Design a protein with these regions (language model features):
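Hydrophobic alpha-helical transmembrane segments
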Residues: 126, 150-199, 255, 362-366, ...
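Interfacial segments at transmembrane-helix termini and the short loops linking adjacent helices
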Residues: 109-125, 306-337, 379, 383
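Signature of the first transmembrane helix
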Residues: 6-63, 161, 220-245, 299-300, ...
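Transmembrane helical elements of multi-pass membrane transporters/channels
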Residues: 10-25, 149, 155-160, 177-197, ...
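Membrane-water interface segments that mark the loop-to-transmembrane alpha-helix transition
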Residues: 9-21, 47, 52, 56, ...
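Helix-loop junctions and terminal segments of transmembrane helices
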Residues: 59-77, 258-281, 343-349
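Membrane-interface junctions at transmembrane-helix termini in multi-pass inner-membrane proteins
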Residues: 119, 129-152, 278, 333-361
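Small-residue hotspots at the loop-to-helix junctions and early N-terminal turns
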Residues: 41-45, 49, 245-256, 323-327, ...
């Protein structure tokens, strides 16, 4: 299949995957915001935000590092044993991360009141995250058979979605939500096991040394993936320490809407990443940028304009106070897209992972320092947190744009 056709196919299935990833929460959102009290929905949003952070931790950049390694092995038609060893070591490394993640959850539950008060709900939610280790998304991405991953995800979420609609009617049934996620994840793991058998893949004895080395390799990818989630997670966690569950609900809803949009647009970068690994073409990345950034800018403006009416339809009148927060945070849509494009598909493929990591760490520290400064001086408000989120994304953009211009001569023409 020609490269362009493969890119289109990969991008189509990744976009469909992300559409489903965004659609299911949006479909369930108007139901839960109307059935649950604002306070309980705030608790739900807070726990979900923490779980999104932990999901990135458990993934630890393997969606890029392991995908890249498997794609190279597959392209070179290397020894199948080497292929299976990478899969096994990656799985073992992620299990270690999953166990460490459990320790992190328990520590957070001790110090964060919302998590402590919803302990069983928090632990059940994390177990659903832990089960994602066994879905092998990195494998299907590396083999460029993304349709398997997408179809499985849609089936899994459909089951969870339908169960939630029928059985979650009021506040005291909140625990059902992660239990349904666990049930659907188990079904998905069963489907994945059948696909592994079809591919005639087998697990070999894991190497602890190789697994730890893979963690070291993936760390820089993790830091990059961590950026958008870290910005959102840090902001929400700080708000949860200071503000009421109702205010957490307003901010969490805003982050959920904007974050889902950012993730959807970010799939373009995932779609072109394998091709950029092969070509390292400046012309190609410029073509993609010139065609997409004006559209993303127009989309961002549209979100800002139509937020009030959209929020009223989506969540109901009681969440209208969140409209101004969403309008501020919407500015990050454009810059987040540019940052994703300038990250691994651009700087990463010319072996400037260090610069991608530096930009991520620097902007994350800026975000955290700004929030803690406002907190220390008693000047923390929801709108100021949203504004800091925008400025942080702009800081990240400026750093990555500087590196792109500095190293642009290293691309192929």
């Amino acid at each position: 299949m020609p490269n362009l056709s493969q890119i289109k196919k990969n991008t189509f299935w990744l976009i469909l995957f992300q559409l489903a990833k965004m659609a299911f929460p949006f479909l369930i959102l108007p139901i839960l915001t109307r059935r649950l009290s604002v306070e309980v929905y705030g608790n739900l949003t807070y726990v979900k935000t923490v779980m999104n952070f932990l999901q990135i931790f458990v993934d630890f950049g393997f969606m890029l590092s392991a995908t890249k390694e498997l794609a190279k092995i597959n392209h070179q038609k290397s020894d199948r044993t080497k292929f299976e060893q990478v899969i096994t070591n990656t799985l073992f490394a992620r299990i270690l991360l999953g166990l460490l993640g459990l320790v992190i959850v328990l520590v957070l539950c001790i110090f964060i009141p919302i998590l402590h008060q919803n302990l069983l709900f928090t632990l059940a939610s994390y177990f659903a995250v832990f089960l994602s280790i066994f879905l092998f998304d990195f494998l299907f991405r590396g083999l460029e058979i993304i349709h398997i991953m997408t179809i499985r995800f849609i089936l899994m979420k459909t089951v969870s979605f339908l169960l939630t609609i029928f059985f979650v009617q009021q506040d005291n049934q909140l625990l059902y939500i992660p239990l349904f996620d666990i049930f659907s994840s188990v079904l998905a793991i069963i489907l994945v096991s059948f696909e592994l058998k079809k591919l005639h893949l087998h697990f070999v004895r894991p190497s602890l040394k190789a697994s730890l080395f893979s963690l070291k390799t993936s760390f820089i990818y993790f830091l990059s993936d961590f950026s958008a989630t870290a910005f959102n997670a840090i902001s929400t966690i700080v708000i949860g320490l200071v503000f009421s569950s109702t205010e957490v609900a307003f901010f969490g809803l805003s982050i959920q809407i904007i974050g889902a949009t950012q993730s959807l647009l970010g799939q373009l970068s995932s779609g072109i990443y394998p091709e950029m690994v092969r070509q390292k073409s400046l012309k190609f990345i410029n073509q993609v940028s010139q065609k997409t950034t004006p559209l993303v800018l127009l989309f961002t403006i549209a979100v800002i304009i139509f937020t009030p009416i959209g929020l009223q339809i989506l969540a109901g009148d009681k969440y209208l106070p969140a409209a101004s927060l969403i309008q501020i945070l919407a500015i990050t849509i454009f810059f987040s897209f540019c940052n994703t494009l300038l990250g691994w598909p651009t700087l990463g493929v010319i072996n400037h992972q260090k610069q991608v990591t530096i930009s991520t760490v620097a902007s994350t520290f800026f975000n955290l320092f700004s929030l803690l400064t406002l907190l220390f001086f008693g000047q923390l408000t929801l709108h100021r947190v949203a504004l800091i989120r925008v400025i942080t994304e702009l800081v990240l953009f400026c750093i990555r744009l500087y590196y792109f211009r500095k190293f642009r001569q290293e691309f192929n023409l």
